[in-house]
Regions:
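Electrostatic, structured charged patches in enzyme active sites and in nucleic-acid/phosphate-binding
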Residues: 1-204
Length: 204
């Protein structure tokens, strides 16, 4: 997936222009296939969740525009899922706008509006934000192999146990990068990541 570089339609160009004036943290992404561009804080938050969704292969910001009864619309994301499903997604405050959903259907696009309450529910967003601070901090090979070997032997470790494994990088930096790159797994829904959080090898 990539952005068009020439002759962008007017609504798409306007969306790029607006997003280029915004800066939201964390800056790092893992599965965004082009430049991360967000028009709202809420869209950035949804992007955080896309990076920790095990079913997501890749995602793209502001992918296209399509006609609706309200005028041209540019969705926040195009998301490729496992199994070949491709969906256009908007971050919305409450519910989808019927005219936009209808416009997507008429254009032959699979579309979904994700409400704020779904994004902010539980601890997943807060944990994703914390880990994405380290998205660009690649865990050194020695530490990766030590961690995977320790998990192979023990079956699982707590975060506190993992502190003894890492030697070349800070433990939570290494753990975060390995989680984001699907080398290890943790439950990030039920509580904030802490010393007792259990770490396992990512299921293959």
């Amino acid at each position: 997936m990539s952005h068009p570089h020439f002759e962008s339609p007017a609504a798409l160009y306007a969306a790029y222009e607006l997003a280029s004036t915004k800066l939201y943290y964390p800056r790092g992404t893992v599965r965004c296939s082009a430049d991360p561009m967000f028009r709202t804080r809420f869209a950035r938050d949804l992007g955080c969740l896309l990076d920790v969704d095990p079913d997501v292969v890749a995602w793209l910001c502001l992918p296209t525009e399509f006609e609706t009864a309200l005028g041209p619309h540019v969705p926040d994301f195009l998301v490729d899922y496992e199994g070949g499903v491709r969906m256009y997604i908007d971050a919305v405050d409450e519910t989808e706008i019927p005219e936009i959903a209808e416009g997507a259907a008429l254009a032959g696009l699979r579309y979904r509006a994700v409400p704020r309450r779904e994004v902010e529910e539980g601890f997943r967003l807060a944990n994703a934000r914390d880990m994405l601070r380290y998205a660009r901090c690649r865990t050194p090979l020695n530490d990766r192999l030590r961690m995977l070997s320790a998990l192979e032997e023990a079956g699982s470790l707590t975060i506190a146990d993992c502190f003894q494994v890492f030697r070349e990088t800070q433990p939570l930096t290494g753990i975060s990068w390995m989680y984001l790159h699907r080398l290890i797994s943790m439950d990030i829904d039920e509580a904030m990541i802490g010393p007792d959080t259990v770490v396992r090898r990512y299921p293959r």
